[in-house]
Design a protein with these regions (language model features):
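Short, Lys/Arg-enriched N-terminal segments with co-localized hydrophobic residues
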Residues: 1-14
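Structured beta-strand/loop patches that form or line metal/cofactor-binding pockets in enzymes
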Residues: 12-50
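Ligand-binding pocket scaffold of soluble enzyme catalytic domains
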Residues: 26, 34, 40, 45, ...
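Solvent-exposed alpha-helices and their adjacent loops that cap or buttress functional pockets
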Residues: 26-27, 125-127, 153-154
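Metal- or metallocofactor-binding catalytic centers and their adjacent structured scaffolds
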Residues: 39-114
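Glycine-rich, aromatic-flanked loop segments that form ligand/cofactor-binding clefts
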Residues: 104-140, 144
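Metal-dependent enolase-superfamily TIM-barrel catalytic cores that perform enediolate-based chemistry
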Residues: 130-185
Length: 185
């Protein structure tokens, strides 16, 4: 199993990060994912998207973070986080933090896989039994789109629709009418 392949006879993790892949998707709405691959074949994936700045975040990961990550123990998550956060020239800036968050997610993904534990347990335990799921209407929303979304959501047992309604006084938008629109529940 993954757990056994990542452990020595003493039960100590001995993996090293061997490869960093930056995956930029979709020409219209870019999402940026980071994939860290260890020498034992275990990999983790994280989301480093920053709307409109994905190429810059990707360059930061490739140029700055990859040399730091290669050869590192992926279970030393806090050590890596502190090194990057304290060592980055623009500490706390959007580019650095998006890149750092994506790598952080990937490292936690690896730790969850090698320990066989769900992330919620590794991060301190379960907080709730359920999570509210919702549907999203892309682009400018009109009454027809809202009605279709309401039907879609109702069929699937969801209770919330996220949409771009516009200002109440704007022509051609749902504006204030959204509050008076179809109820999904």
């Amino acid at each position: 199993t993954l757990q056994r392949s990542a452990q020595t006879a003493q039960g100590v993790l001995t993996m090293k990060i061997e490869q960093v892949k930056v995956i930029l998707t979709s020409p219209n709405q870019n999402y940026l994912f980071v994939k860290l691959i260890t020498d034992s074949g275990v990999y983790g994936v994280g989301d480093a998207s920053l709307n409109g700045q994905e190429h810059t975040v990707a360059d930061f990961i490739t140029s700055f973070l990859t040399p730091i990550l290669i050869g590192r123990d992926p279970t030393q998550i806090e050590d890596f986080w502190q090194l990057v956060y304290r060592g980055a020239y623009w500490r706390g800036g959007n580019i650095v933090m998006s890149a750092l968050c994506g790598v952080d997610m990937a490292l936690w993904d690896i730790l969850g896989k090698v320990t066989g534990q769900p992330l919620y347990r590794l991060l301190g335990g379960k907080v709730r039994d359920k999570v509210l799921c919702y549907s999203h209407v892309l682009g400018k929303t009109n009454e027809e789109k809202a009605a279709l979304a309401a039907s879609y959501v109702k069929e699937r047992g969801l209770k919330v629709i996220r949409l771009r309604a516009g200002a109440p006084a704007a022509n051609g938008t749902l504006g204030g009418g959204v509050q008076d629109g179809p109820k999904v529940e």
